[in-house]
């Protein structure tokens, strides 16, 4: 062949590879309401920045006639590109080719991208839409999953890993997303489960459809497996871009600085009255969080799961911060098993990637009851104090109202390593509430006597000043000054240099 023929051959092969399973399969994918792998990548990345790797890789399976079913790329599109000018690596299962099933060869494509991301200190994004393991390959496909899981684990805490479930994700395929830092799902399109509805019916005789078993709502509100539930694929991909704007590319960098035009001295007068005078009345903690952040913008994570704790990202004077807060508007803000898990994992993520932690505390205690005790609230609650105590990033705590007992301790208290502890004048820092304490200490007293003692207890302990006298509270502040006080504390601790004793790893109470 001459040069022109060689070039023409390449162009034809390249065009064919770009079609994945072919025009018919692409039309079928569109008819199901889903984009193709390449369309997803093009929407996710900066325009024209995608560089595809291993486009002509193909499987080597000869079982069950597979040697006659060769599709270039082998149902996987992988490579690298940029998001907001920053390097990222990405791989997307191509459902138009072999149903996006995982083979030995396309698993190797994923592992190559994972290793490149790790070497170059860049995030890796997985776009999942797969029928699962390629049955025709048997154990070779399973070994491919194992290699991916291994790379997920090695990269954990070194580079951000993000997964989007944009179709089916069943069986062993579920474990890679769960080993990553954040999972996105699409309403009524994404499904994750270890065993599908048919197997569930056979084994347990339960009648359940795939949406109830493993849909986006189930995993965002009940299991806590997924972090974000989006309405469309487009919203999902844009949300991934937004999430990355708060994160560094790796654990050796800081998150990108965003120039701030929002006055750091801005007072928020509404905070003077947002907390009810009755200490037992609820309020929405986000009415405190949002107004004090840059441009009053809060990017919430896991908004539908364990609503008694609020987590997410924001910025203070241009710097990314992780927010952890008790939510008095839900279960009075008590800590339970799910809330403990939710908070602890987020705290550890922020610590991995040098993101300072701001804690808004209003917690009356841990949720009582046999269900919580029997399911291990002691063990789960300990995860929060472990995560906070282990974290070496700047840690700033603001007590807005209640801070009682063991729950006060675990929510980034001064003795567990917080750098700056602030409190509002109405903060109550005590072993427990006045009524509970008096009922224990003076159980034989009359109701009238108890009321007098309750008033005495409240005057002595239902305020922040006893803790401030002992240095457990660094400063009592007016609510309106919250934004500037947080910015000041963050700037003071910006160059914090702390390291824990050398160890292989700790033994967190999992």
Residue spans of the language-model regions?
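Ligand-binding clefts of soluble mixed alpha/beta catalytic domains
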Residues: 1-510
